[in-house]
């Protein structure tokens, strides 16, 4: 069968280690996905599946487009360095003359000089999970034996910097860390971090369907389910982002790049680049599990969202399937009336469907749990975003806003 090219731009993220991880972070939503593959005690991608993934992904991409490989988990370093050497060799084999990039999300525990030299030499972009100072990070990010991991992650950060690896830091914002935005932000800045992404931690305890599948956390959908004790509160997530934005705009514009601010600016000026959950629709970013199974989204790895298997179907067939088309379009079609009439709709777009388990003001389902936080954040930003857009339009750097005095009238 000839490989088809999907009708629109897409992205595939691979999980070569499946849900296997060397840590036991309390809030991780992926560890329990091992229950979906009970027949396989070890969920690591074999060489045949690796080659199929690389070959199919490159073939499914338009020749003029960059092919962006993303490796995640579980913990992708568990596959060992040789696995990624083979991956890079396969990319060269099947992608001769093509522009290819690699990104890699890790907890950093297994990184050493050899790993970092490889990552630098092959221009990998590394996403390092680090939640802030030790007392915040160690509360939930622990080893299988319950030991703290902060020192190990800071060692990894030092190694990445030593080898000049391109990296960013991924910060999970939970109920505790949401109380200390500037402590988290300043700690990262003091550690030399320049690129930061803040991720809200929101999970519910499992419903009956999920329990039958051996899961502890609630599957997306419906309005049932008790929140976990570590889930961030909506208002506090909004205040967390606002506090960091206000701190950043006074001293760090052009020096520190906070992705949550970058996405908001992109939507404000009508430019591409906003993350999927702040786009009108989704469904163009799928994941490949260790055995070639393809799922609708990283947050929707459940049997009902399985699109097929790469060994039997092309990537194009699965991404352009009616099932996936409906999945992506429902992000907009199922917005409740409260969202459609909201004055920050075009900044928020309802957020991730996974978090839409609340009732809106009229009692209709589909409101995002984080709605109050998003409203607080997105209503705070426009005067500043407009000022930066105006500066850029006049050929001046956005950082000039740090010398400006804005009169912002609260509404």
Locate predicted features.
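Conserved alpha-helical substructure of the radical SAM core
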Residues: 1-106, 110-117, 121-122
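Glycine- and acidic
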Residues: 14, 34-40, 69-73, 138-143, ...
């Amino acid at each position: 069968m000839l490989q088809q090219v999907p009708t629109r731009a897409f992205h595939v993220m691979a999980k070569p280690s499946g849900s296997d991880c060397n840590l036991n972070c309390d809030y991780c939503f992926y560890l329990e996905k091992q229950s979906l593959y009970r027949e396989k005690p070890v969920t690591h991608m074999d060489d045949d599946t690796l080659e199929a993934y690389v070959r199919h992904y490159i073939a499914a991409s338009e020749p003029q487009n960059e092919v962006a490989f993303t490796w995640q988990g579980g913990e992708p370093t568990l596959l060992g360095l040789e696995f990624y050497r083979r991956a890079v060799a396969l990319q060269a084999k099947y992608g001769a003359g093509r522009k290819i990039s690699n990104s890699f999300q890790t907890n950093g525990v297994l990184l050493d000089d050899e790993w970092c030299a490889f990552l630098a030499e092959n221009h990998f972009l590394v996403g390092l999970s680090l939640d802030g100072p030790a007392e915040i990070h160690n509360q939930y990010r622990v080893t299988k034996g319950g030991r703290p991991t902060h020192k190990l992650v800071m060692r990894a950060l030092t190694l990445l910097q030593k080898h000049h690896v391109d990296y960013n830091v991924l910060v999970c914002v939970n109920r505790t860390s949401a109380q200390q935005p500037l402590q988290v932000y300043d700690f990262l800045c003091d550690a030399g971090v320049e690129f930061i992404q803040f991720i809200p931690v929101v999970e519910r305890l499992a419903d009956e369907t999920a329990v039958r599948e051996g899961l502890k956390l609630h599957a997306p959908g419906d309005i049932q389910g008790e929140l976990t004790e570590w889930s961030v509160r909506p208002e506090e997530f909004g205040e967390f982002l606002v506090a960091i934005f206000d701190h950043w705009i006074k001293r760090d514009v052009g020096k520190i790049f906070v992705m949550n601010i970058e996405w908001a600016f992109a939507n404000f000026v009508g430019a591409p680049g906003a993350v999927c959950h702040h786009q009108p629709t989704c469904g163009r970013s799928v994941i490949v599990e260790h055995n070639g199974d393809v799922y609708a989204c990283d947050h929707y790895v459940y049997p009902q969202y399985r699109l097929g298997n790469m060994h039997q179907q092309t990537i194009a067939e699965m991404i352009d399937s009616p099932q996936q088309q409906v999945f992506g379009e429902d992000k907009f079609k199922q917005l409740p009336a409260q969202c459609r009439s909201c004055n920050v709709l075009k900044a928020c777009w309802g957020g991730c469907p996974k978090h839409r388990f609340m009732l809106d003001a009229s009692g209709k389902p589909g409101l995002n749990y984080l709605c109050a936080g998003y409203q607080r954040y997105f209503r705070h930003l426009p005067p500043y975003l407009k000022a930066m857009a105006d500066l850029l339009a006049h050929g001046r750097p956005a950082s000039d806003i740090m010398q400006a005095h804005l009169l912002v009238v609260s509404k």
